[in-house]
Structures are given as structure tokens and as C-alpha cells.
From Swiss-Prot:
Protein name according to UniProt: 4-hydroxy-tetrahydrodipicolinate synthase
Alphabetic keyword roster: Amino-acid biosynthesis, Cytoplasm, Diaminopimelate biosynthesis, Lyase, Lysine biosynthesis, Schiff base
Name of the gene this protein is made from: dapA
GO cellular component: cytosol
UniProt: pyruvate binding residues: T47, I205
Reaction equation(s) it catalyzes: L-aspartate 4-semialdehyde + pyruvate = (2S,4S)-4-hydroxy-2,3,4,5-tetrahydrodipicolinate + H2O + H(+)
Annotated SMART domains: DHDPS
Xref: InterPro entries: Aldolase_TIM, DapA, DapA-like, Schiff_base-form_aldolases_AS, Schiff_base-form_aldolases_CS
Length: 297
């Protein structure tokens, strides 16, 4: 679904010092991300600490961000769960709130079969009018959604795309070759964005775009317009920063980076912990080589 945008940021969830959600800061961050190149935002995905944000907090975040953003950009609600019924109910609530689409992660922990994955996503998609984006991230879910399952699901009209974070480029090529023409493939890994664009993917659902969104957007637009040399140069330039943002589990590094740069997003909820000094020093050193696109003040 091309109108959701080529550059979508998987947004962190800001917390106050007491650990509660900072809805006002989430709104400020959302607007800053749109100002720095993002076409849309994923709210309460992996980067938004979805496992430790309650359903009530999720719904309030969907509403707060959508209220702030309005028609300036797309709001994609992270409504997935490893219970089909819970994911369905969460998606229907997000639809009532008025978000633009939903992101549905492969069910984690319970290790469904490929048929189970197909029925899980089919059940949710057929119950909502929202555009649904599949999210394949086997490094977190253990279960890998096969290309055949994605291709099969792409025949359901409101399953409009997939965030592919498996890193399996051969599988991704198979998907791109066999889905319907308007089915959209986004990279789910910042480091895979340019390679996947070269294979026919549309864009990226990004973490690094919190701080270098304009540069990632330029890389994408350069590639699309045929200036592949510039796109490749930007990709190479951003690689060390991207590496530092994933040196430990996301969103630990990006939250540290934002706080260090002066955009307060608070801490993390257990069992996630804040960056230790070794990690923090690595991130600080990496940031020295980059222009920061996010408006900080």
C-alpha cells in the first residue's frame, strides 16, 4: 500500500520519570519525526516496547499520536499478539480510534505452524477494514513466516504488505516476485534497506530514522530516481551508526541516543534495562560523525 509511505519510523514510547507513558512527549516526537523525513509512524511496535505497554496505554497512545499527527502522516498501530483473539480485539479497537493501518507481528513463543500463521492473519484481516501489514521478525518470534505463507496471505485484499526483518534476501526476492502488484514490501532492518530496494522493495520501517530520517529519505529517493551512486554513498555513510544502534537489543540504544542528544524519552520498562557505560560510550562515539535530523528543541 504505497500511500503509507516509503519511510516509516518504528517510534519509541516515551516514559516519564515515574515510568508512566508520556503522551505529550510521544506527540512531540511524532511531529518531529514527520518534520525529519518520515511519511508515517508505527506506534507501539517492537521499538515502542509493546510487550510491556498495557492495552489501555496502547490505545491511549494510538489516540494521542493520531490526534497530534492528523493528516500530516500515517499512523500504524502495533496491534499484534500471540493470541489471535487478543490481536483481533486490539485491532478492532485501533480501528475505532481512527488509525490508518495496523502492524501484525508473527505470533511469538507458541510456535504456530505455517497453516496456523495463515489462519491467524486471515482471521484478523477479515474482521477489520484496516489495511494490515504483516511483520516477520524470526530473531524475536522464533517462528519464520515462509515466503509461501506471505504469498498466500497477499491474496487477502486488506493485507497490504509485509515488514520483512528476517534478513533472508532469497526469501524476500521470492515474495516480491510472487505477490500481487500492489502488495508492499518494507525492509524491517535498517541495514537491509538499500539491498532490498534494489530487489524491488518499496521502503523501510526504520529505527535509525529517529535521528537521521532526512538522510535515509534521501537515500531512498536517490535510489528511486536512478542516482544509485548517491544512494550507495549514503548507505555506506550510515552503516556505522546503524550498527551502533543495534549493538544490544532494540530499543536500548536508540532510547539512549535520543536522551543523550537532548530529546527526552525516559527509560525502559523491565525486563529491558538502560545502556551500560560500554554501550553508551560506543553510541556517543558513533554519533559524532553524523548530522542529527530530528528537531531536538
Amino acid at each position: 500500500m504505497k500511500e503509507l509511505g516509503r519511510l516509516i519510523t518504528a517510534m519509541v514510547t516515551p516514559f516519564k520519570k515515574d515510568g508512566t507513558v508520556d503522551y505529550a512527549q510521544a506527540q512531540k516526537l511524532a511531529l518531529g519525526l514527520l518534520d525529519s523525513g518520515s511519511d508515517g509512524l508505527v506506534v507501539v511496535g517492537t521499538t515502542g516496547e509493546s510487550p510491556t505497554v498495557t492495552w489501555e496505554e496502547e490505545h491511549a497512545l494510538f489516540a494521542a499520536v493520531k490526534s497530534a499527527v492528523g493528516n500530516r502522516g500515517k499512523v500504524i498501530a502495533g496491534t499484534g499478539a500471540n493470541s489471535t483473539q487478543e490481536a483481533l480485539e486490539n485491532t478492532l479497537k485501533a480501528e475505532k480510534i481512527g488509525v490508518d493501518a495496523c502492524l501484525l507481528v508473527v505470533p511469538y513463543y507458541n510456535k504456530p505452524t505455517q497453516e496456523g500463521l495463515y489462519l491467524h492473519f486471515k482471521t484478523i484481516a477479515e474482521a477489520t477494514k484496516l489495511p494490515c501489514i504483516l511483520y516477520n521478525v524470526p530473531s524475536r518470534t522464533i517462528t519464520h513466516m515462509s515466503p509461501e505463507t506471505v504469498i498466500r496471505l497477499s491474496q487477502i485484499p486488506n493485507i497490504v504488505g509485509v515488514k520483512e526483518a528476517s534478513g533472508k534476501l532469497d526469501d524476500i526476492a521470492q515474495i516480491i516476485n510472487n505477490v500481487r502488484p500492489d502488495f508492499t514490501v518494507w525492509s524491517g532492518n535498517d541495514s537491509d534497506t538499500l539491498p532490498m530496494l534494489a530487489m524491488g522493495a518499496y521502503g523501510v520501517i526504520s529505527v535509525a530514522s529517529h535521528i537521521v530520517g532526512k538522510q535515509i529519505k534521501e537515500m531512498i529517493t536517490s535510489f528511486v530516481s536512478g542516482n544509485t551512486d548517491n544512494a550507495a554513498a549514503i548507505h555506506r555513510h550510515l552503516t556505522p551508526l546503524i550498527r551502533s544502534l543495534f549493538v544490544v537489543s532494540n530499543p536500548i540504544p536508540i532510547k539512549y541516543a535520543l536522551n543523550y542528544l537532548g530529546f527526552e524519552v525516559g527509560g525502559l520498562r523491565l525486563p529491558m534495562t538502560e545502556a551500560d557505560e560500554k554501550t553508551a560510550a560506543l553510541i556517543r562515539e558513533s554519533l559524532k560523525g553524523y548530522t542529527i535530523d530530528l528537531p531536538i528543541k
